[in-house]
Amino acid sequence: MKLYVFNPDADMALGNNEENYMAPATIRRMAEDLALLPIWYAQPGSGVLASSAYNADYLKQMQQLFRLDVHLVTEPELPDYADVRVMPWGWNPAIRKRMLKGGVLEKNLPTPDALDKYRMKAARSNALAFRALFYFNKIDYTCGDGCCLVEADGRMTDISPDIVDRYKEGCVFKSLWSGSGKGLCWCRHGFTKNVSDWCSRALKENRGFVMEPIFDKVEDFAMEFYSDGRGKLLFVGYSRFVTDDKGAYRGNILTSDEQVEEWIQQYVPFEAFVRIRNMMQKALEIGK
């Protein structure tokens, strides 16, 4: 049986990389409030880890309305499901320890070495390869010039304030692991002490960060792909969402894929957009 777990702190926990990591209170509250989110994508016959106190009635209603073949599993019940296959929102040392401590068999959990490899694959720096891919293949309607990875041994002397001078509109520094707009440092008014301190922490904790120009962004959306586990990667749809002026996630726009494609054609010809999507799919398939 598969056991689905919604842990929205997955990317932040990867950045911390400690098994005793504790997410901020707001993220912990989100995990509690949305614990049943996996019922909408869980395979039939699976369990979803959540508290029964305020989730049981809601799940019962959804089961009656939509004939969902999923059931609730609480934390104290984990020893009864020791041989499950855990399906978290994202793996990291903290969720591994939580499942192990709860009673899941260690053989059913990823090893520390596997988590290290997963962490490197999840690093934001991997996205820089796509910039080079689009550049060398001369793909129209793409941007990304000026994005780079800053690596060092943790000493602030390894990065010069002059590095930001080439960006007329300023630049943004991004942690290698973060989510929902966290882990961003905006440099709009020169290399201030706050920016310098942020860079020092990023170099010390993660040995690097990504630097990008501040683009004249219109809106946000994402392409979503699914790996079938047998070497095939499929495009499954779009996600259109909203962020604030600091890049923090604020919510999603409920819309169909067709409506997203109609919207995007205001800015990019559809044929060019499909070429970009297809190249992304092929590159992800090769790189996974």
Where are these regions (language model features)?
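Well-ordered, non-membrane alpha-helical segments in soluble/globular domains
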Residues: 24-36, 124-133, 156-158, 192-197, ...
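Gly/Ser/Thr-rich loops at beta-strand to alpha-helix junctions
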Residues: 9-12, 53-57, 90-97, 177-181, ...
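ATP-dependent carboxylate/phosphate-activation module, predominantly the ATP-grasp catalytic core
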Residues: 227-287
